[in-house]
Amino acid sequence: MRYLGSLVLFVCLAGVICVAQDVVSVVHGTVTKVDHDTKTVVVKAEDGTEHTIKVTGQTTYKGTKEGLDGLKEGTEVVVHKTGTGAKETGMEIGKIGKDSVKVSEGTVVKVDHGAKTVVVKGADGTEKTFDYTETAGKDMGQAIGAGAEKGAKVTVYYTEESGKKIAHFFRF
């Protein structure tokens, strides 16, 4: 009986922990404001929605070595964020540009979870293979859980490192 009580307690605690986890989502848009005092970045998404995103010491940056200082009004960015409304927190921010984070759109041809790669066929018919990061793998996992895999339309946000295309963000 004592073991049953422990099991019930464990299951309840695990449920609370799972509920407390925030869903991660991707926002692509343009920086309209950077506030260094409140450590926030306002990003106007493609659909016109403005997201006030809190940055922390845990926030990582791609495409800029200056971190928050590298983001200016008018900068095109992609953001991994948690939370909604006034509680949006940036986990990773990518500055989009020819010498930083690049964008590729297409259709998923193949996903290899073991090798952490995805092959995407572009509109011109060429196939590109992307290695993906752990964070991007979570995007992939959420999309596959929602039924998206081979044949899904995808936008890949990537950098080129040592001759490889490294996907940091996926948007399905």
State each model region's role.
Residues 2-135, 140-172:
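Short, flexible, surface-exposed loop segments at domain boundaries
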